[in-house]
């Protein structure tokens, strides 16, 4: 399927996401979620089901791999170049106005089913209704078979607070929760087999494919203490309880 390729000489780097570090101060985003957890949770429970209009005429996985240094599709800037093993997608006009607070989801599928998984999810990932402004998918031709992002975590969705003060609104949290549930359902409906969940992540029993990590307050090595801390993250609880 087509990808628009403007003839522009733009220097657009891959996503720069803040690395995990020890002793990180709890940002105001997290404090807001903790202090307003019950109110946000109650508001979310009363909201109607969200609907996501799927984008049409989106690239397939092969097309994504061929996006090169710069391409456009459905308002998303795409790039896949150099030694980076990921194909990056970034919404040209972000819907979320806050600063990244570390919240992200991985999607893990069987290595050989990444193209099929992308085909199942692409209409949602490129949807104008999607709450996800930035995401990436592994270019499976660039990674060795036993690599972490080969066995699982082939998709990463970065979630940013929707408000300018870097706080999440109840409506955005509800929309995000509904969106990830929709991704789960779509993969299951299409017979996609789940992959290896990263040791660094947590997920409830009913999630077969998605998992969560806050990368400002955790590392890739994981461990039970880290997973317990992640299960207590207010953002994660609002997505799962």
UniProtKB/Swiss-Prot annotation:
Effect of residue 149 to D: Loss of enzymatic activity
Null allele phenotype: Strains lacking this gene are attenuated for systemic virulence in mice.
Recorded consequence of changing residue 134 to R: No effect on enzymatic activity
Reported pH dependence: Optimum pH is 8.5.
Predominant location category: secreted
Stored Gene3D superfamilies: phosphothreonine lyase
Name under which the protein is recorded: MAPK phosphothreonine lyase
Source organism: Salmonella typhimurium (strain LT2 / SGSC1412 / ATCC 700720)
